[in-house]
Amino acid sequence: MSAFTPASEVLLRHSDDFEQSRILFAGDLQDDLPARFECAASRAHTQQFHHWQALSRQMCDNVRFSLVAQASDVADCDTLIYYWPKNKPEAQFQLMNILSLMPSGVDVFVVGENRSGVRSAEPMLADYAPLNKVDSARRCGLYHGRLEKQPQFSLESWWAEYSIDGLTIKTLPGVFSRDGLDVGSQLLLSTLTPHTKGKVLDVGCGAGVLSAALASHSPKVRLTLCDVSAPAVEASRATLAANGLEGEVFASNVFSEVKGRFDMIISNPPFHDGMQTSLDAAQTLIRGAVRHLNSGGELRIVANAFLPYPKILDETFGFHEVIAQTGRFKVYRTVMTRQAKK
């Protein structure tokens, strides 16, 4: 994190107004402004493990990664600065959670890019902290209000689920394909054959649907699942539990917290980080897989057909094959051999 996002640049236009504020930053924290902003005190809460990694280097214990904020995260903050994400249910979940912990009268600022739907903040918070737009620049909006009424927040009420092939998939706001199985994952699932064995790592596990489906017809697999998203980690744990399946699930920035080697790595890697297009996670996945695959181990990923993954696969492993495709998606497979670049 170094360059500021457009949303942060809009906030900096008002930096003099925050010099005496004790601020809690939350939402889609794409840069390190929370660590560098000049104010009386600064704390941050994030559901994204990679954002926590970046901010904790400067903020230490004043930034926390978790599914829900707690009273200790709010502490004595008198101001909330919330960065609007592209996912409206995710924003509602986070805002209702955080505002339920803050006392009436605190200042509430919401900032985000217009294309993210930040205008939705006004009707969303109308009953709790009526907002007014105070700035519009860099194709972003900045809104301000004061908390008049604390919302009620119960984590249990935010859980949702859907079924696929007899499996119960548990989901939360902010989890990829929360409302049902996406087409890409469906294509990848079609290539996973019964009686698969060995250690399988599911990177970017989302709600855990790939691992649950694999384990349902291949009971001898040993599952490890990871994701940068706290909602995804909790949803995957809940999905495994709901279907009587076992597996280790934890937060990781691709391989950052992964130990050991595996017989198969599966993934539907993201190519967005918030509103921004980013191939970083997929490149890290492909290039880093050689350090986490056993000899003869397999990497199998699904991706939009237009993304430049074949080149990276060939550079890293020496070859790749397409084992399934539609007009929009391709499933790539490659194997750990001596020619792979370790």
From Swiss-Prot:
Domain of life (superkingdom): Bacteria
Record bears the keyword Transferase: yes
* Listed EC numbers: 2.1.1.172
**One GO cellular component term noted in the UniProt record for this chain:** cytoplasm
Tell me which UniProt keywords the record has, alphabetically. Cytoplasm, Methyltransferase, rRNA processing, S-adenosyl-L-methionine, Transferase
Please list the GO terms describing molecular function: 16S rRNA (guanine(1207)-N(2))-methyltransferase activity; nucleic acid binding
Asked if S-adenosyl-L-methionine is a keyword of the record, the answer is yes
- Which Pfam families does the UniProt entry name for this protein? MTS, MTS_N
Known catalytic reactions: guanosine(1207) in 16S rRNA + S-adenosyl-L-methionine = N(2)-methylguanosine(1207) in 16S rRNA + S-adenosyl-L-homocysteine + H(+)
- Enzyme class, UniProt record, top EC level: transferase
Q: Which InterPro entries match?
A: DNA_methylase_N6_adenine_CS (IPR002052), Mtase_sm_N (IPR013675), rRNA_ssu_MeTfrase_C (IPR023543), RsmC/RlmG (IPR046977), SAM-dependent_MTases_sf (IPR029063), Small_mtfrase_dom (IPR007848)
Q: Where in the cell is it found?
A: Cytoplasm
Major site of localization recorded for this protein: cytoplasm
PANTHER family for the chain: RIBOSOMAL RNA SMALL SUBUNIT METHYLTRANSFERASE C
Say which family it is in: Belongs to the methyltransferase superfamily. RsmC family.
Q: How does it assemble?
A: Monomer.
Query: What HAMAP family does the record point to?
Result: 16SrRNA_methyltr_C
Function statement = Specifically methylates the guanine in position 1207 of 16S rRNA in the 30S particle.
Q: What is this protein called?
A: Ribosomal RNA small subunit methyltransferase C
